[in-house]
């Protein structure tokens, strides 16, 4: 008689009441640990991994998770060439000593700060701009533990995932950036995922226009999301030198040391 895996191996994704392991689940490995750990260790007759370490989504995750037709991995990260592995690690890492659905990669794991203050090190995989990372964990870390940034500019709420975190004036991070696996900007331009940003600000991409929420001019302020100045505001464009005078590092933090 078939047995439901989750009847013995607890899965938080199926526990809508948040009750935790019950009955036959007590004392047994979690579903994620069991499934990812077992499949991640599988080898063929020659001893080669059936699911390649660090392989593409099509060769690994999509063998079980929703695949190409569902497009569960899309948005800015996918457009940038990042794979599931770059954020989550390989199957053995996912099936290791982490709490499923809780110990997840974070925005701050790759966006570790700004142009003047961000993580450095030979064990980090940097994007061409030298600021952002292309891997949410340190090279050589078999557990793929998400990096914690020392700079809080792009940091999630303490103890919270991105999808539950809030930023500017209590707004959900997802309200401006999109959902975790479909962060803006998304291609193609005319895509259902882009409807919200189109409706809110008239074009695709991260919701960045202050006039989306604010009906009045905000003037010369650096109190926007992540310490930004007013965007699309003629008053700031005309008088921004007043902000820059005496403290160009305020500008360099985002525009770079050369202010380009």
Regions from the language model: what does each represent?
Residues 12-260:
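Inter-heme linker and motif-flanking segments adjacent to c-type heme-binding CXXCH motifs
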Residues 4:
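Phosphate-binding beta-alpha-beta segment of Rossmann-like dinucleotide-binding domains, i.e.
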């Amino acid at each position: 008689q078939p047995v439901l895996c989750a009847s013995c191996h607890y899965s938080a994704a199926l526990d809508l009441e948040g009750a935790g392991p019950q009955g036959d689940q007590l004392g047994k490995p979690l579903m994620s640990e069991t499934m990812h750990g077992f499949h991640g260790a599988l080898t063929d007759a020659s001893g080669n991994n059936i699911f390649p370490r660090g392989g593409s989504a099509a060769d690994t995750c999509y063998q079980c998770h929703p695949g190409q037709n569902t497009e569960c991995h899309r948005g800015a990260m996918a457009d940038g060439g990042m794979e599931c592995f770059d954020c989550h690690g390989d199957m053995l890492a996912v099936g290791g000593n982490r709490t499923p659905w809780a110990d997840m990669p974070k925005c701050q794991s790759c966006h570790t700060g700004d142009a003047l203050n961000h993580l450095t090190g030979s064990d980090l995989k940097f994007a061409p701009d030298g600021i952002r990372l292309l891997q949410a964990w340190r090279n050589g870390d078999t557990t793929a533990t998400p990096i914690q940034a020392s700079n809080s500019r792009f940091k999630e709420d303490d103890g919270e995932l991105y999808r539950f975190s809030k930023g500017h004036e209590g707004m959900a991070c997802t309200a401006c950036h999109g959902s975790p696996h479909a962060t803006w900007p998304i291609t193609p331009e005319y895509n259902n995922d882009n409807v919200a940003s189109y409706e809110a600000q008239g074009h695709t991409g991260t919701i960045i226009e202050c006039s989306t929420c604010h009906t009045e001019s905000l003037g010369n302020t650096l109190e926007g999301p992540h310490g930004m100045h007013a965007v699309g505001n003629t008053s700031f464009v005309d008088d921004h030198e007043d902000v820059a005078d005496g403290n160009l590092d305020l500008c360099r933090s985002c525009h770079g040391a050369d202010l380009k």
